Amino acid sequence: MNPVIKKFQFGQSTVTLETGRIARQASGAVLVTVDDDVSVLVTVVGAKTADPSKGFFPLSVHYQEKTYAAGKIPGGFFKREARPSEKETLTSRLIDRPIRPLFPEGFQNEVQVICTVVSTSKKTDPDIAAMIGTSAALAVSGIPFDGPIGAARVAFHPETGYLLNPNYEQLKASSLDMVVAGTKDAVLMVESEAKELTEDQMLGAVLFAHDEFQAVIKAVEELAAEAGKPRWDWTAPQANTALLDAIRSEFGAAISEAYTITIKQQRYARLDELREQVVAKFSGEEGQPSGGEVKDAFGEIEYRTVRENIVNGKPRIDGRDTRTVRPLAIEVGVLDKTHGSALFTRGETQALVVATLGTARDAQLLDTLEGEKKDAFMLHYNFPPYSVGECGRMGATGRREIGHGRLARRGVAAMLPSADEFPYTIRVVSEITESNGSSSMASVCGASLALMDAGVPMKAPVAGIAMGLVKEGEKFAVLTDILGDEDHLGDMDFKVAGTAKGVTALQMDIKIQGITEEIMEIALGQALEARLNILGQMSQVIAQSRSELSANAPTMLAMKIDQDKIRDVIGKGGATIRAICEETKASIDIEDDGSIKIFGETKEAAEAAKQRVLSITAEAEIGKIYVGKVERIVDFGAFVNILPGKDGLVHISQISDQRIEKVTDVLKEGQEVKVLVLDVDNRGRIKLSIKDVAAAEASGV
C-alpha cells in the first residue's frame, strides 16, 4: 500500500494525516503531525471474531508518552518508561469516552487503540492530536464504527473570547480549559475546568468547539475515502423479540414494581430474585435460550421499564421528581487529629473527605515530557468495594479512581488561594464510604468543606451535582442528582461543579446522538438550581474558611533575607541549615530571591528556627547593646562576638573609664560581656564599647 497523506487547516495549525507507511499490519494506523509541534502515531487493531464468553465489548485505549519524543532519557534505575503516568491514564480515558458509544450495539470483537507520542516541541498538549489520530485510524480500519469524530481544545478570555487549541502558554492566561469531542451532528464528550464562568459561556465554548472541529471530520472522511480498508461484513445479532415479549408479559409488572423500592439494597435483592425466576423459567431445557441470553433479555426489560416510566412523567426509582436533590447530611471536623475533615452524605452516596497540609517539600514532583514540575495540590479519590456492598480487589489505583479524582480536583482547584497567599502543600483524600450515583460530585462538596474546616482560605465554597437524561423519540427528561441505576440506564452523564457565581468544572458523556443545544441548556439550568440548593445547605454548617489553621497542622513562618546572606544560612555543604533543622525539628525552604519558608510541627519549633536564621543574617545596629563573648585578646583591645560570624573590636580605651595597662587585667577569653555598637565602617568592621553601656542603658537604649 502506498502512503496516503492528507493535510488540512485546523484553526491556526496545519494538521497532516499519513497512513500506509508505518505500522502496516495494524487494522488501521495513522501518523498525525500538527505543524512542527507534535507527532502522534495511532494504531487500531480489531479481532476478527468475538469471544462469546466475555459478554461485553472489550475496547481498550492506551495513550503513551515516550520520553525520546522530547529528546529525554527516562530517569530511574531501568532507564525506560514504566507504568502509565496519571496524565497518560487521563488522556486514555479522554479518548475512550467519545468513541465507545459509536461502536454498534451487539459488537463484541476486541478492539485495541494505542496512541504513541513520538515527537513534541513541549509547547502544546498532544491529546487533541491523539484524538484526531484515533478517529482517522478507526475510519481507515474497516472496523464497524459510526464515526468519524472530531476533537478540539477551547480556551476563553473575557476580552478576546474563545481560542481554538491554545498552547500551554496561552492556557496560563485563560479562564477555561475545555476539551470537546463529537461527530458531525452531535457533541459526545466534554471535559473542562474553569474560573467561575457562566453557564452560557460554558455552553458557548461547547458549540464553538463543535463548529471548529468539523474541519477534522471532513479531512478524516476524505482520508478514509482514499485509503480506507473495506468495511467489515458484520451484522448485529437479531434480538429475540419472542423472549422479550414473554418476559415482559409475565414479569413486566413485577419488574416495574421492583423499581419503586427506594432502598438500593432491597431493590437489588428483589431484582436478583426476579432474575433467577426468569432464568429458571425461560432457559435450561433443550431448545430454550441460554441463561446468559435470558439475563441479557431481562436487562433489556429493566432498561425499557425505567426509561418509559421517566419520560412518561412517573416518579423516579426513589420516588423523586426530575428536579429534586436527595436529602443531605453534612458534618465537618469529624476526625479529631486530622487537619480538616468532612462527612458529606447525599441519599445513599457518602464521602469521608480529609484535608492535610504539608510543607513545600511535600509537593508532588512530576516528571513530564515538558520537564520536571511540582504540584502543591493533590486530590485522591478512593472507591473501596464495600461502598457498594461488595467484596472486590484491593490494590493499585484504577483508571476510574484517577479520573474521578481529577474531576473533583478540577472542581475545587480554581477556588484555592495562590502559593503566595498560602504556601502550604495541600492533599485532599476522598474515601467513598457509600455509593449510589455521583460520588465524584460528593467528593467536590466534601473537599470544599474539609478545606474550609482546615482553615485553607478558599475564595468561595464549591458544590457539584450530576445530571442525567432519558430521551425516547421526541420525549426527554433531564434528571437532577442521578442514582447509579439512572446513570447506567440513561443517555447522558452530565456533571457540573461550581460556586454560587459560576462553573468551575464540567464533564459530559453522551451515549446517543441528537442531544440538542436546548437539552444542554436545560441541564445546565437545572444543575445551577441544584448547586445553589446544596451550597445553601453547606453554608448552614460552615459558611467560610476557619480563621485559624487546625492546631494539628504545621506552623508556617515566612521571612526574607538579603540574597548575599543565603550562603551564610546554608553553610558549607549545607551544614548550617542542616544543624538548624535537626536541632529545632523544623524544615526550611530558601528561594533564590531570599524568600524563606519555615515549617514546624509546632509553633515553638518554627519560631526557634526563625530566630536562628535571624541571628545568622542579622546586621550589627549602631547604638544597640549586645551580649557577646570575648573571642580573642590583643594588646590594643579585645574582639567580641556579638552575632554568628560577626566580631567587633573593643579598643583598650573603650573597656573602662579607668586607665588600663593590660587588657587581660580586666577581660578573659570566653567571658560574656555587654557591649554597645559605636560604629560600623564601609568595610563592615564593628567598633564596640564596654564603658558606654551603663550610660546607654540609663538613657533607655
Curated annotation (Swiss-Prot):
Residues 623-691 form the S1 motif domain. Transmembrane segments: none annotated. It comes from the Bacteria. Its cofactor is Mg(2+). It catalyses: RNA(n+1) + phosphate = RNA(n) + a ribonucleoside 5'-diphosphate. InterPro entries: ExoRNase_PH_dom1 (IPR001247), ExoRNase_PH_dom2 (IPR015847), ExoRNase_PH_dom2_sf (IPR036345), KH_dom (IPR004087), KH_dom_type_1 (IPR004088), KH_dom_type_1_sf (IPR036612), NA-bd_OB-fold (IPR012340), PNPase (IPR012162). Keywords: Cytoplasm, Magnesium, Metal-binding, Nucleotidyltransferase, RNA-binding, Transferase. GO terms for biological process: mRNA catabolic process; RNA processing. Component of the RNA degradosome, which is a multiprotein complex involved in RNA processing and mRNA degradation. PANTHER family: POLYRIBONUCLEOTIDE NUCLEOTIDYLTRANSFERASE (PTHR11252), POLYRIBONUCLEOTIDE NUCLEOTIDYLTRANSFERASE 1, MITOCHONDRIAL (PTHR11252:SF0). This is Polyribonucleotide nucleotidyltransferase. It comes from Stutzerimonas stutzeri (strain A1501). The lineage of its organism: Bacteria, Pseudomonadati, Pseudomonadota, Gammaproteobacteria, Pseudomonadales. The gene is pnp.
